[in-house]
């Protein structure tokens, strides 16, 4: 499966992305204030380049959302919102689960799912009246690894160590492998 299969959506401008980030921060703040007793999960995808959406990326996004809902099946979910802007898919969930426990579940999910590395599963709390993300390292988790070289992702991102083309190719390979495995297990389920 070629890269175009995954990156076939509409290209966006930097100004669109900046506006979307601002709107996301406002939405997060609103939800944290509206549900002060709950924990907020904000889900987006790590998709480099000007194309943030496509039918296949939406399929990946929805697979992860379903996995989140399954992981939280025993916990009270107070609110859910799924948005599909061209600037990248967004999902918000408020649960009664303490934020620390929610973050630990999301770290486990990111690790267990082969496509978990493509997601930002941010657990947010209010700090000085602003949304603040709980870091995986604060909870004893290791920093996220780069798709390409397995070094710390933040360092590679800050240094722009890899081109958009390299990252998209790595993501395409990951997704191709994921969907092929998924299709093989579906086929063997039917023949078994």
Curated annotation (Swiss-Prot):
The protein's name in its UniProt record: Probable apo-citrate lyase phosphoribosyl-dephospho-CoA transferase
Function as written in the Swiss-Prot or TrEMBL entry: Transfers 2-(5''-triphosphoribosyl)-3'-dephosphocoenzyme-A on a serine residue to the apo-acyl carrier protein (gamma chain) of the citrate lyase to yield holo-acyl carrier protein.
HAMAP family in UniProt: CitX (MF_00398)
Pfam family, one: CitX
Top-tier EC class: transferase
Source taxonomy: Bacteria, Bacillati, Bacillota, Bacilli, Lactobacillales
Enzyme Commission designation: 2.7.7.61
Disulfide bonds: none
Gene Ontology biological process: prosthetic group biosynthetic process
Protein family per UniProt: Belongs to the CitX family.
Range of residues in the leader sequence: none
Catalytic activity: apo-[citrate lyase ACP] + 2'-(5''-triphospho-alpha-D-ribosyl)-3'-dephospho-CoA = holo-[citrate lyase ACP] + diphosphate
